[in-house]
């Protein structure tokens, strides 16, 4: 069966924004206008097509990135709706990895908000071209010019409008297209009837000025256009479109559009811009992987149906009807249902049962998926997020994704014996779906500990266990993931010698420990000369240190950011063994704890609080009382924004405190930023608590 849409006519896009900027509603409208749904669902009524999990409908936020496919003007548009809440950054991260372009949705009243900055940074990391849709132009306080200025001020983005709104709030009635110099007026509530009219006289001058600014911004990286512009030559619509497309695809320019998805204005024009300015799989740089057996040999996955099959699995989900669904993006070649593929990341052979094209939560079975497309497979048992799938002869591994470690932990226990097994299965499935969610059993207490990226993240996962897996569990108080590190260098000896009749045990090491830079992790250096410690025991020394570091030296927390140099030692021909050197290394670490000034580190969160100005004093006082450090303040519209770094341990229950301090008018976002040393008095309390004193 031949493909329905050529690669040139395919777009893989994400819709990303701050929570509540109207992202899901925008996606809904796209589906409505492209004929994918026949009735529009509202997020605040819990009826949205894209928010298909129960928790999403209850909370009115998007958690999982639902992938859906739509058609517009002879093009296939695959859309991934990504969550805007900071606890779900991993969802954004993994969808950006497989997209060719994105639509950033802004709230016309607030402009760029904290989470917009986070996802914008992630998109820049992955080199994703973007167009910006200033949504909610009908909202009280909507200000298009202000929103555009926040793109420059907060993101330093080379952005310029390619549209201008006529009116705002209740008066928002038409949109000027600056590329074609036309005006579009909406005449019915559903936004399906649009009149093309001349630009009204009183808006002509403003439109011409804005067009000149647009050409200037695009021409910065386009010599031909710059020449014409400086020579006052006429620039045709096609020339300008080509230049905008080129600059957008090169991630050097961001076109800005406007509208209101809720009131059905501007969405079709935004869809036109997706087709006109965002790249097809052919326009982006081909993805480069490496050979599975030789990491230094680069392999290019070309977007070509006749090439060897290569795809990246970017999401795993459990569907109540079909079981495990693996979403993947095909970079080269084709895949048919019923065929075998190789998971080159794990070196496993897998059989693809069925192939599905998803539409939020309904699905259509397909026989073949082609390069540049996004689909879901049923039947892949071993494949997880970030794994490469390829043809059995192909041996490519595409660059995988890196996921942050959890910063918050809770203990969970099943309410009844019957829930025990179900809970174990639920935790295994949830970990498969979400790489930032960890679960393990504490060896000392026997408790099951779950870890994630924030309170809301874990809340929702516990909620899912109850609703999807029927597991009732009791949840303990949140626990912070502390770490330990050394502040001073020292040289120490670790010697293990045991004689108890028969063969003894002997291992002796001299190790120099030095602090590593923040985030540098553990580095081991072998500086042994002349074989005083035989080569076969060196890995045991490193492993012994790693194992001992897991349990720290002060309060049982992992020791991080330390360098260890093995420079001397001794061995015994008969009595030395791998185990003896492992124990010697752990004894050296114990010795280092006495000399290297160990300290406890705590996770520091970057917190952004927005509230009316009159509450500023209370909020600042509260941040200081929580051991926070204010990093700056700025006015935003008629509100004030405070940026601060606050220890995670002080942020539990902050939502309630902020509500009472601002009478419900304040909002905040926070995400993990770095680890910092805990004050001595608090460190002593932590150590006492962990030793059970």
From Swiss-Prot:
Domain of life: Bacteria
Limits of the tr-type G domain: 8-282
Gene Ontology terms: biological process: ribosome disassembly
Membrane-traversing stretches: none
Gene Ontology cellular component list: cytoplasm
Sorted UniProt keywords: Cytoplasm, Elongation factor, GTP-binding, Nucleotide-binding, Protein biosynthesis
GO MF annotation: an example: GTPase activity
Principal place of residence: cytoplasm
PROSITE patterns the UniProt entry points to: G_TR_1 (PS00301), G_TR_2 (PS51722)
Residues reported in the UniProt entry to bind GTP: 17-24, 81-85, 135-138
HAMAP family: EF_G_EF_2_B (MF_00054_B)
Family of this protein: Belongs to the TRAFAC class translation factor GTPase superfamily. Classic translation factor GTPase family. EF-G/EF-2 subfamily.
Protein name as annotated: Elongation factor G
UniProt source species: Staphylococcus epidermidis (strain ATCC 35984 / DSM 28319 / BCRC 17069 / CCUG 31568 / BM 3577 / RP62A)
């Amino acid at each position: 069966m031949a493909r329905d849409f050529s690669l040139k006519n395919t777009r893989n896009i994400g819709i990303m924004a701050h929570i509540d900027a109207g992202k899901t509603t925008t996606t809904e409208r796209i589906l409505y206008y492209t004929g994918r749904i026949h009735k529009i669902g509202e997020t605040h009524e819990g009826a949205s097509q894209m928010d298909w999990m129960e928790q999403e409908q209850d909370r009115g936020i998007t958690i999982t990135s639902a992938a859906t496919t739509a058609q517009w003007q002879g093009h296939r548009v695959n859309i991934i709706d990504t969550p805007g809440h900071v606890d779900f950054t991993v969802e954004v991260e993994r969808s950006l990895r497989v997209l060719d372009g994105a639509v950033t949705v802004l709230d016309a009243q607030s402009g760029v908000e904290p989470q917009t900055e986070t996802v914008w940074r992630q998109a820049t990391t992955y080199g994703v071209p973007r167009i910006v849709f200033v949504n909610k132009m009908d909202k009280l306080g909507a200000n298009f010019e202000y929103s555009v200025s926040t793109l420059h001020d907060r993101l330093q983005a080379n952005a310029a409008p390619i549209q201008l709104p006529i009116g705002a709030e209740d008066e928002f009635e038409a949109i000027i297209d600056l590329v074609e110099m036309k005006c579009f007026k909406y005449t019915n509530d559903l936004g399906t009837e649009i009149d093309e009219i001349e630009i009204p006289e009183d808006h002509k001058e403003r439109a011409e000025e804005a067009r000149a600014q647009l050409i200037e911004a695009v021409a910065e990286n386009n010599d031909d256009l710059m020449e014409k512009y400086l020579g006052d030559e006429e620039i045709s619509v096609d020339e300008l479109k080509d230049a905008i497309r080129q600059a957008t695809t090169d991630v050097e320019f961001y076109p800005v559009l406007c509208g209101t998805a809720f009131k059905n204005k501007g969405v079709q024009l935004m869809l036109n811009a997706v087709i006109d300015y965002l790249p097809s799989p052919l326009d982006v740089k081909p993805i480069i992987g490496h050979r599975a057996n030789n990491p230094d040999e680069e392999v290019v996955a070309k977007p070509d149906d006749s090439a060897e099959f290569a795809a990246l699995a970017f999401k795993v989900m459990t569907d109540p009807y079909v079981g495990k669904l693996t979403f993947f993006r095909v970079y080269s070649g084709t895949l048919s249902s019923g065929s075998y593929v190789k998971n080159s990341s794990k070196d496993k052979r897998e059989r693809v049962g069925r192939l599905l094209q998803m539409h939020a939560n309904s699905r259509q079975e397909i026989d073949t998926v082609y390069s540049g497309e996004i689909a879901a497979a049923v039947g892949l048992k071993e494949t997880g997020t970030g794994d490469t799938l390829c043809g059995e002869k192909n041996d490519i591994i595409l660059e995988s994704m890196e996921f942050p470690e959890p910063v918050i932990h809770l203990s969970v226990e099943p309410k009844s014996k019957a829930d025990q097994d179900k809970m174990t299965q639920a935790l295994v499935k949830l970990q498969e779906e979400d790489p930032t969610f960890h679960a393990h059993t504490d060896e000392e207490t026997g408790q099951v500990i779950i870890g994630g990226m924030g309170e809301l993240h874990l809340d929702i996962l516990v909620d899912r266990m109850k609703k999807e897996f029927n597991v009732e569990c009791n949840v303990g108080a949140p626990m912070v993931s502390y770490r330990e590190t050394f502040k001073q260098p020292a040289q120490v000896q670790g010697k293990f010698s045991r004689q108890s009749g028969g063969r003894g045990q002997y291992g002796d090491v001299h190790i120099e420990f030095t602090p590593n830079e923040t985030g540098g992790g553990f580095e081991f250096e072998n500086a042994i000369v002349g074989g005083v410690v035989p080569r076969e025991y060196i890995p045991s020394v490193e492993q012994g240190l790693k194992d001992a570091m897991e349990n720290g030296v002060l309060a049982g927390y992992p020791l991080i950011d330390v360098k260890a140099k093995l420079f001397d030692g001794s061995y015994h021909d008969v009595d030395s063994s791998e185990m003896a050197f492992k124990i010697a290394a752990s004894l050296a670490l114990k010795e280092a704890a006495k000399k290297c000034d160990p300290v406890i580190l705590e996770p520091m969160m970057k917190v952004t609080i927005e509230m009316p100005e009159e509450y500023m004093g209370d909020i600042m006082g509260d941040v200081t009382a929580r051991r926070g450090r204010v990093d700056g303040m700025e006015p935003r519209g008629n509100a004030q924004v405070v940026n601060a770094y606050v220890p995670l341990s002080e942020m539990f229950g902050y939502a309630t405190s902020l509500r009472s301090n601002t009478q419900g008018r304040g909002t905040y976002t926070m995400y993990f930023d770095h680890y910092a040393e805990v004050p001595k008095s608090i460190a002593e309390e932590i150590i006492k608590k962990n030793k059970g004193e």
